[in-house]
Amino acid sequence: MSIERKVQNETGRNPYRIGANVLLLVAFFLLFHPLLSRGSLMYQPTISHWLTAGAFVPLVLRPWRRNHPFAENHTRLYAAVLLVHDVLLFLSAAAVSLILVEYMVKGCVITLKQSFFQGWICYVAVYAAAYLICGNVRIGVCLGMAISMIHGMIDHYVMLFRGTPVMLSDIAAIGTAANVSKGYSAPIELSVLRAAAAAVLFCVSVCLMQRSFKVHKRWYFRRLFSLPCVLVLAFIAYTGIQTVGTGLAFWQSSRQYSEIFYFLRCATSSFVKQPEGYSADSLSDAQSEFTGKQGTKTPNLIVIMNESFSDLGSVGALETNEDPMPYVHKLMQGQENTISGQLTVSTFGGGTANTELEFLTGDSMAFLPYNCSAYQVFIKSEMPNLTSGLDSLGYQTAAIHPYLSTSWNRTNVYRFFRL
C-alpha cells in the first residue's frame, strides 16, 4: 500500500485533494473578495468582512469523514453537525450568487443593505428549491449556482442591448429577441468571465468536499424537510417588502434592487386587474359626451411610425450651427392646413408594438404589467381598434413593416385588428 493511500485510510483525508482544495480556495478568494469593494460596500467594511467570512466558512470548516473517531462515536451529533454545515453552505452559496450576479449586471454591488438581504432571501429560496428537486447538497449547490448564473448572463445582455432588465413577460418575446439579436454582436466581457470563473471555483470546491455520511438516506425525508423551507422563504420573499414598509417603484431603475428580487416582484405584478371605476355604464356615459355630424369625405389615411425619429431639441437645449429639421419645424410653427404636436410614448429602448397598441386601440399601457408585450401576452382574439369600422365605410386597410412579420406576434395581431 502506498504511503499516500495509508495516510488517507488513517486520517480520512486525501493529501492531494486537500492541496487542490487549498488552491481552489485561494483562487476563489482572489476572484471574489475584490468584488466586495465595488459599489457602496467599499464604504461598509463591516459588511464586506462578514460576507467574506460567510462565503468561506462552509468551505473551510469541512465535516470529518465517517471513519473519523468523532463521527463513529457520536453518530447523532455528527448528523446534526452535517445538517448545520449544509444550511451554512446554502446560505453562503446564496450570498455568492447575489454578489456575482449583481457584479455581472451592474458592475458593482447593490447600494442598500435592505435590498441586499431581500435578494439574499430570494436566492436562499432558489437553493432550497434546488435541494428539494435533487435531494443532494452538492448537486443542489451546483444547480442553484447554474440557475443564478444563467439568469445573470441573460439579464446582463438584455440590459446591454435594451437598457431594461429581463422580465417574465420576455419569455413570450423570445422569437422576437432571436430575430433582433441577429443584428447584434454579444461581446464576452471581463465581468461575465470573472463572475463565471468564481462560480465554477465555488462549485468545484463544494464538490471536492470529502463526505460519505448522509444526514438521512431516505429521499422523501429530505424533500419533506426542505419543502416547508421553500414555502416559508417564498412567502418571505413575496411579502417581505411590505413587512419592512417599502414598495417596489417600477419607474425607478432596477439598480435600486437586486436583480433576482426585481425580477420576482415584477413577475408577481404580471396580472391585469380591472381599473378602478371601469364598467360598461361608465364607458356609455363617457361616450355620450361626444357628439358630431356624420362626415361625407373619405380621405386616404396614412400613419407612419418611425421609432428612430425624434426632435432632441424638445427635451433640452440643443445648440447646432443649422436647423437639423427645418421642414418639420416649419410645419410645427403653424404651416397652413397643418395640425401638429408632440407625442409622448410609454416605451423606452424598444417595445414599438406597445406604441402601436396605444395608437390603434386608445388603451394605455398604464393598466398593463410593467414592461410587458401586450401583442404577445394579451391580444388573443379580435379587439376593437381604429381600423375596426373602416371596412364598413369602403376602406381597405393594410399594414407594412420593414422587418420580419413574426416579431411581436404582428402576423396574428394584425389579423385580429383586420389589417
PLM regions with names:
Residues 1-2, 307:
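PLP-dependent class I/II
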Residues 2-254:
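Transmembrane and membrane-interface helices of multi-pass
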Residues 240-419:
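Soluble catalytic regions of membrane-associated enzymes that act on cell-envelope
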